[in-house]
Amino acid sequence: MGAFLDKPKTEKHNAHGAGNGLRYGLSSMQGWRVEMEDAHTAVVGIPHGLEDWSFFAVYDGHAGSRVANYCSTHLLEHITTNEDFRAAGKSGSALELSVENVKNGIRTGFLKIDEYMRNFSDLRNGMDRSGSTAVGVMISPKHIYFINCGDSRAVLYRNGQVCFSTQDHKPCNPREKERIQNAGGSVMIQRVNGSLAVSRALGDYDYKCVDGKGPTEQLVSPEPEVYEILRAEEDEFIILACDGIWDVMSNEELCEYVKSRLEVSDDLENVCNWVVDTCLHKGSRDNMSIVLVCFSNAPKVSDEAVKKDSELDKHLESRVEEIMEKSGEEGMPDLAHVMRILSAENIPNLPPGGGLAGKRNVIEAVYSRLNPHRESDGASDEAEESGSQGKLVEALRQMRINHRGNYRQLLEEMLTSYRLAKVEGEESPAEPAATATSSNSDAGNPVTMQESHTESESGLAELDSSNEDAGTKMSGEKI
């Protein structure tokens, strides 16, 4: 069985809630992946004396969902019940927990749950080789604690801008690379021993068996980075998401898109669903999960924004009808053709950060109404190509996501030239054999044929584009 389905699974899991002056919504979609390996946690009011605290997290599993699912249920308990976390609470209430104790307790909780899961029989005997990233926030009345282990990401939107982002843990990062090499490993094609695309994770015990090294000195470390930030009146929202989201949207793009959607709807589940759909239409091939946490100062629904959004929908509906009427004599155009025509137009008031992909559902609804016999699969534009042509487009798209500078410009030109040739009926270029190197390469990998956690299925990536946005943009104290 391959890593991808023939058609994406677009059914979504949703949840929402409110409390402690917060509102949250979440959405997750399996997408093109054969399995759903993401999980999440959302707790408003932490039990046992922390009722005015809240905890949210996203877990991006790889090589299976075992670790991600267990962590989503038990990580918070491992954090709040260990002695390091509770040390300061002995003298008073939860409000008196010191910042350092909370941060140390979070770190201890990660190490303890990783040690605990190692004893599971299926993980111990190698029957299950899964692992998971974890990104979360613990929100107290005065502080926000950002927690990250892996390459999922959290961002804080404050006073109309992205003011903080967690840093992705990639093998190519100098600090991570040094630890990997000190443990006897190597970094090849941006991966640990040429295979695993994250340098910190829970689980992944095949990468945590170097004799004489502690748990935080292994090829893959379970140690999280913890940042503490004082809450402010200007705080608007926090986004937690896996790399299936960040692969196709930058920090700023996603935050601007979310802000624009909050101005047209106060339903946080809907906003999260729009994000997931938009990322699918932008070409994400991974599982997708997002948790949106809104503070009291989050953007409110605006009559003007609602009006502009409605006018945009009507304009798009009208244009789709016109395009299909003009093409009537030549036969019904496919949806990809309609999208290409619209993408070449200067359409005002498209959702910032989302662009035309953010209105794909509107366009597709009109197209399906006018062409009821079409088999809709919810795929992105590239996925509507067939056979080797579709594979070529996908390979070029994945390379485009993961390259910058001159390489990226070259790939943009290749992709544009290919699409133009197809539209004009010219012969398409042959599919290059080495374009999409398997991400499951086991070169130097202690795990044979394990599905590696990767942001794209191309092993040719020079630089991970998401690192461009990673890292703190504001001085948050880090453990």
Curated annotation (Swiss-Prot):
Matches recorded under Pfam families: PP2C, PP2C_C
Compositionally biased region (Low complexity): 430-439
Positions with biased composition (Basic and acidic residues): 1-14
Residue ranges of the region described as Disordered: 1-20, 423-479
Top EC class for this record: hydrolase
Any coiled-coil regions, as ranges: none
The gene coding this protein: PPM1B
Protein name per Swiss-Prot or TrEMBL: Protein phosphatase 1B
Main location: cytoplasm
GO molecular function: magnesium ion binding; manganese ion binding; protein serine/threonine phosphatase activity
Keyword Phosphoprotein: yes
